[in-house]
Amino acid sequence: MALHQYLSETYGPTKPKNKTKKKKKESKSDANSDKTSLIVKERLSTLQQEQEKSGVASFSKFDKQKSKNIWKNLETNELSHAITHPSASSITGNESKNDLKEIRAQEPLVTVADKSKTRKTIYRDAQGHKIQEDSKIDDSSFSRSKYEDEKAAEREQYLKNLNMGDVQKLGINVDAHDKKKNQTASSLTIEDPAITFTHDKERTVKTSLLGRKLYDKPAPENRFAIMPGSRWDGVHRSNGFEEKWFAKQNEINEKKVQSYTLQEDY
C-alpha cells in the first residue's frame, strides 16, 4: 500500500498546488516531502507496534477488571459476579422521569434480596455467644433446671460455712421460729397498758435518744455523759484521765465554795 494512498484515505485528498509558485520552490518542497514521507513511515511503524502492545494491555486490563468484579463466598466457596444496576448517569435523555423513579425504587429491593440469599441466620445463646451450625438449638440446654440451681446454692452455702469461725457459726445456729416468738412477745409487752402498774425492774429497758439499748448496770462516768451500750462487757479500759478530770473539777468547786463562805462582811 502506497503512502500517498494511505494518507488520502485517512486525511482526505490533497489540495491542488499553486501554479504561480516558482520551480525552485517546487524542487525544495519535493525534497522536504521526501523527508517527511520517511518520517511518517517510521512513525506509522512505531504506531502499529504501540497499538499491538496497547491491544494486549487492554485485553489484560479488561480481564483484570472482570476478575475484580468476581467475589467469593467464604462459607459456600462459590464464585459470583457483581450485579451492575443501571444508574441515573447511564440513562439517556429520551427516557422519562417515571423510568428513573422506578429504577431507583428497585435498586434497594434487589440489593436486599441478594443479601438475604447469601447471609445465614445466626443463633445465639442466653449469654449472647454465637452457636455453631452443628449444634442444635434447644432451649432446655440453655436454661438451667431448678435442681441444678438448688445444688449450686447448697454448694455456695457449704463453702461459706467452711470459711467461718466458731463465733460466726454460733450466731448462725439460731432458730428463726424463736426469733419470731421473741418479736411477738416484745410487741405485746409494749402494747399492753397494764405493764405500767407492774414494778418489775427486769422489764424496764434503758434506751438512748436514738432508741438503742444501753448498759443496765452501773458504769463509770465520763465528761460527755455518754452511757455504754448494751453489749459492753464491763471491763474498764481507759487510762484514768476521766477520773482525774472529775477529781480536779470537784477540787475547783470546793475551793470556790470555801472562798465564798470564808469571806468577811464589812
UniProtKB/Swiss-Prot annotation:
GO terms for cellular component: cytoplasm; nucleus; Prp19 complex; RES complex; spliceosomal complex; U2 snRNP. InterPro entries: Bud13, CWC26_splicing_factor. One of its GO terms (biological process) is maintenance of RNA location. Pfam families: Bud13 (PF09736). Residues 16-26 have a biased composition (Basic residues). Residues 1-37, 118-149 are annotated as: Disordered. Residues 122-149 have a biased composition (Basic and acidic residues). The keyword Lipid biosynthesis does not apply. It is found in: Cytoplasm; Nucleus. Required for efficient splicing and pre-mRNA nuclear retention. May also be involved in positioning the proximal bud pole signal. Belongs to the pre-mRNA retention and splicing (RES) complex composed of at least BUD13, IST3 and PML1. May also belong to the CWC complex (or CEF1-associated complex) composed of the U2, U5 and U6 snRNAs and at least BUD13, BUD31, BRR2, CDC40, CEF1, CLF1, CUS1, CWC2, CWC15, CWC21, CWC22, CWC23, CWC24, CWC25, CWC27, ECM2, HSH155, IST3, ISY1, LEA1, MSL1, NTC20, PRP8, PRP9, PRP11, PRP19, PRP21, PRP22, PRP45, PRP46, SLU7, SMB1, SMD1, SMD2, SMD3, SMX2, SMX3, SNT309, SNU114, SPP2, SYF1, SYF2, RSE1 and YJU2. Interacts with IST3 and PML1. This is Pre-mRNA-splicing factor CWC26. It comes from Saccharomyces cerevisiae (strain ATCC 204508 / S288c). The gene is BUD13.
